[in-house]
Amino acid sequence: MNSKLLYRIGIVAMSAMLIVAFYLALVFYPVLVESAEEDIDVIFRALFPLISVFIAPVAGLVLYLRKKPAGLTLCAGYAIFMTAASVFSIGLTGFNVANVLTVILYLASAVVYLLPQSRFSFDPDSSPVDNALNSLMWAVLLVFIVIGPVLLPARYIGMIVGLVVLLLVLRGFVGLKK
């Protein structure tokens, strides 16, 4: 595979995640409004996951469009994490299938990290915008993993699976940088 094809695969993967996020918002908005009339806590339990579903693909897509392959890794890690959490809490749905497809697209383009321009952390040559977006993605992933189990107790197993996958991804990149 050449780098242009890998780049296109990455854009398709994150665009798919963004479409899934909009679909999710449309499906769950009426349910949230109805549930909030009975219990306002429902909004707080659902708000963070819904916001993070939007932030992950947007920040990842912007990073990737700026030729920063780290955006694809972070989005894929998030997709794996959300898929595991969703499967354990609500079973197999269209949302989970979309996440699985995103992960498959990511795996197909994993060799992009062998390219010289790959960056996974702060880079003195990068613009402040690139570094800020990279940090934002890490914040979304880490905060969701830490706060997620408190807000959504049914997803403990998914959180653990997501954290393990994230640690494996980190370990892989530490190995690549040496």
Model-derived features with residue positions:
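Topology signature of small-to-medium multi-pass alpha-helical membrane proteins
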Residues: 1-178
